[in-house]
Amino acid sequence: MDPLGAPSQFVDVDALPSWGDSCRDELNSSDTTAIVNTSNESLTDKNPVSESIFMLAGPDLKEDLQKLKGCRTGEAKLTKGFNLAARFIIHTVGPKYKSRYRTAAESSLYSCYRNVLQLAKEQSMSSVGFCVINSAKRGYPLEDATHIALRTVRRFLEIHGETIEKVVFAVSDLEEATYQKLLPLYFPRSLKEENRSLPYLPADIGNAEGEPVVPERQIRISEKPGAPEDNQEEEDEGLGVDLSFIGSHAFARMEGDIDKQRKLILQGQLSEAALQKQHQRNYNRWLCQARSEDLSDIASLKALYQTGVDNCGRTVMVVVGRNIPVTLIDMDKALLYFIHVMDHIAVKEYVLVYFHTLTSEYNHLDSDFLKKLYDVVDVKYKRNLKAVYFVHPTFRSKVSTWFFTTFSVSGLKDKIHHVDSLHQLFSAISPEQIDFPPFVLEYDARENGPYYTSYPPSPDL
């Protein structure tokens, strides 16, 4: 019987050393089929592991990552290893740790390790090299995270050990002591190591797959509903769950009938005032989050900024399409940044100038995001938006805009003006009132010739 309680016929202790091992070598030089990269949701995190992988893998890795369109916390995604010794790189995103959300962080970190191993199994990989997924700047306590990492790997190998021959944990000098202390607990090489490790055994060792268990969230379901349970007391004792927790938490309390409320909305029976109040509450939640969130990474893109005023004295806001790497950023954070910047602008009349100039498929905002933005923002955004100047459109963008404004947000249709050249734009907004990205001026000069200080008014605007 080893410290995790696995019967000897289920786990061969003599085989365990080949399953788990730790090393202080660079992860990139690990002789494994795949190595693990810990990153953020846009897969652009700058940490020692990621930077080393990007440097050695070469520029092709960045191109491959753009196709993934990010990675959510707890997920795992696969790319080639390119110039690395490993054939593959498995990318995952560890959770940010806050003590009051400890359970959620534990579950997310478990998912990281579990999904990496599951992906390795599906791709028939014989070995995996793990970095420490819980990066220091995300604040996860090292020892707690190490328990989850080793336990999850151990439980996975108990079930699927025949498919994965070796797992390597590549650790730094700071992490090595913790891993050396806890590795014998989950991968004991002798009975002596087993006994020496017992004091480090945590109270919660998870379920059969290593997943963290929250007792009060366990719900018992009878094997044979409707059938009399003769051994009710015996089974309750064996279950080991305190049923007194059930019903005592917020998620178990009675709430209003949400489906009924939605049905009333669909039937038009909910008053206009109630709908507006509900929408305002939702917008205020987004606004509060926008004011408290760190959005510096989105701001640094310089994709949205205020410039001068148009010929009618209305504020001009500029959106630079080429500066929006849709596949590499968290689009919810982009929405938060839009609200953060625009909330005080939208209290009075304004216009938007969108530069579609030299955008690629990686810069195009999809209709679902635009519809979400339109639905979330306050009514003042729509009421005070007087025009959207769509500069340097393509045929495809014109068709997409027509479909979107016809079938999704018809209220915008009459406000959209396609502007093929800056000559046309200057009939509505003076050149001195707009801060142009240099590439926009260069493109327009190349396509439409240099501009001058006076222009005939365009009938389109």
From Swiss-Prot:
Domain of life: Eukaryota
Domain Macro: 1-187
Occurrences of domain CRAL-TRIO (ranges): 297-445
Pfam family, any one: Macro
Keywords of this entry: Phosphoprotein
Phosphoserine modifications at: 244
Gene3D superfamilies cross-referenced by the UniProt entry: CRAL-TRIO lipid binding domain (3.40.525.10), Leucine Aminopeptidase, subunit E, domain 1 (3.40.220.10)
CDD domains the record matches: Macro_GDAP2-like, SEC14
Annotated SMART domains: A1pp, SEC14
Matching InterPro entries: CRAL-TRIO_dom, CRAL-TRIO_dom_sf, Macro_dom, Macro_dom-like, Macro_GDAP2
Family: Belongs to the GDAP2 family.
Protein's name in the database: Ganglioside-induced differentiation-associated protein 2
